């Protein structure tokens, strides 16, 4: 984490900022991204936004792999396989999440679902390359990580175009793997309703209880965060957040969106852990 902070500070200095500006990192990244979105050729260039985001991703990846290696003692290929399962699984269902979250998140972020070429291409390439490295260990999965990675790469190339028609095409490409999978396995889109099928997914009542508790606990936690920060509604939060950013008074530690995002990520991690506990995602399966 210290190395990551030093790298981010260095990148800020290299691009004309001060190291102390790291406390306003969100505002800086938002401004840089808005400037880049106005210039089509700038979207092709690797900039400060990409450098900092990749520093954060690599730091989190390093922590993940180190923790797994030290605590579990798995072989490196098993770690890569687990990483591919988690990454491709999230990428597979991301379009559905975009669809359900669109009415809410659109109020906070104009660029949603994310149509950034670097975002889509990098995730697609990582998923594809990692899947090729450990493909034999992924044969028992009921989805194909290579297929998911391929469509994300295709969506990345299409996202270079800013026309509204192409934005719709990007979403269709992202949801294509799930649509193709649902032809073979109708319960793929809503696997909770699945009892027996060729998808090799078994969800019993105990897991349904865990899932329900997880969803309600997450919603309660989000409501608690809004209450703690003194907001009565998401609309009020959105207006005050935008005003703070414009006035230069934005503080990421006091931003409920950051805390809500961490709650969602933690919930996703607990959901994956529930799958692993039931043996759906495990080193033995891989």
Curated annotation (Swiss-Prot):
Signal peptide bounds: none
Domain of life: Archaea
GO cellular component: plasma membrane
Transmembrane annotation, as ranges: 52-74, 79-101, 142-161, 168-190, 203-225, 257-276
Subcellular location: Cell membrane
Keyword Membrane carried by entry: yes
Keywords (A to Z) from UniProt: Cell membrane, Membrane, Transmembrane, Transmembrane helix
Membrane topology: Multi-pass membrane protein
Keyword hit for Metal-binding: no
Record's protein name: Uncharacterized protein AF_2133
